[in-house]
Amino acid sequence: MKITVLGCGALGQLWLSMLHQQDHDVQGWLRVPQPFCSVNVIMLNGESFNRNLTTNDPKHLLQSELLLVCLKAWQVSSAVTALLPKLNPECKILLLHNGMGTQEELPLNEHVFLHGVTTHAARRDGNTIIHVASGMTHIGPTSSVIIDDNHLADTLHQALPDVAWHNDISAACWQKLAVNCVINPLTGLYNCRNGDVQRYPELIERLCAEVASVMEMEGYHTSTESLLSYVNNVIRSTADNTSSLLQDLRSQRHTEIDYITGYLLRRARSHGMALPENARLYELIKRKESDYERIGAGLPGSW
């Protein structure tokens, strides 16, 4: 399969390495055009992948059957919009990022958009990407358009298992959003690993109650209890992980909070609902972000 991976960070390099090893015709795409990208990944089994892979080849992009978007949520709109005229109409676009709300920012177009939520974890250590935790990737459309692309799910599963197809991914996206609304701001606020947020059970319950109330208004059957159970399971299973938002704060990068808690607050506002706990955490993270962005020269640009 001919694939372009947009964004060559930790997750992008992980997918590039895995797809290349399955003999797919894959390239990366960088914001600043370069002829190749040095992909250095240490796999879960300790083996290393070190290759210079092609990047930013417009002919490859035009012929691509899949654009796999591995950017931060706030980078997606401008980057994908710039590439839309350069893609063939049959090219599917799979968005793999934390949070929700990016597709609404894109111009109307004819492409099939798919969303993915993943529990794979990778981190950067210098010039090397370390695959620190295997996981599950769920993909599918968020619209009511009937698409059945188990073949794509199977292709991706062969490269980086497990991958499952959903005819409507929306519920899975909201579940992941609930987890992110708890783990990301709390780890960012308290500068701790995922497991350490278990010290704040009452706060976690209040956050889950607010998320559940919005999900109910959005048409998803859930409860505070079921959401709390799910979130706590994820906290325990990822206890040693450092959240992406905390990594961003420590590196003084722009975070994805506007597409995590920010998205939740926007949906709540549309239903006339107030979410005091989530709103408080959102403001605290934005304050941390603005402290260093005011000193720096605007948003970091590399992806």
From Swiss-Prot:
NADP(+) binds at G7, C8, G9, A10, L11, G12, N98, A122, E256. The active site is at K176 (proton donor). GO terms for cellular component: cytoplasm. It catalyses: (R)-pantoate + NADP(+) = 2-dehydropantoate + NADPH + H(+). InterPro entries: 6-PGluconate_DH-like_C_sf, 6PGD_dom2, ApbA, Ketopantoate_reductase, KPA_reductase, KPR_N, NAD(P)-bd_dom_sf. Its main location: cytoplasm. Its EC number is 1.1.1.169. Pathway: Cofactor biosynthesis; (R)-pantothenate biosynthesis; (R)-pantoate from 3-methyl-2-oxobutanoate: step 2/2. GO terms for molecular function: 2-dehydropantoate 2-reductase activity; NADP binding. It holds the Pfam family ApbA. Substrate binds at N98, N180, N184, N194, S244. It is found in: Cytoplasm. Keywords: Cytoplasm, NADP, Oxidoreductase, Pantothenate biosynthesis. Belongs to the ketopantoate reductase family. Catalyzes the NADPH-dependent reduction of ketopantoate into pantoic acid. This is 2-dehydropantoate 2-reductase. The gene is panE.
